[in-house]
Amino acid sequence: MARLIRMDRTGHSTLAEWRADDPAAVEAAVEAFRRELDLGYLAMVTTGPGKAEQVREFPVDADTVILRRPIAGG
């Protein structure tokens, strides 16, 4: 089962789980994904060992989608 997780102060929180053959679960995951993007989170998926890329559309076929805040500092 695929997961949508948000990196946060607790480490991470699972926001949704889905299987591509479960339309209701996919729709719930898409809604959670869009809500977090609207709050300013960035969505990342793994593209290989030690590599990831940012996504702006929900990747139904991904095993894990990680949401994180942009890096900030000064």
Describe these PLM feature segments.
Residues M1-A72:
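Ubiquitin-like/PB1-type beta-grasp interaction modules and other compact soluble beta-rich domains
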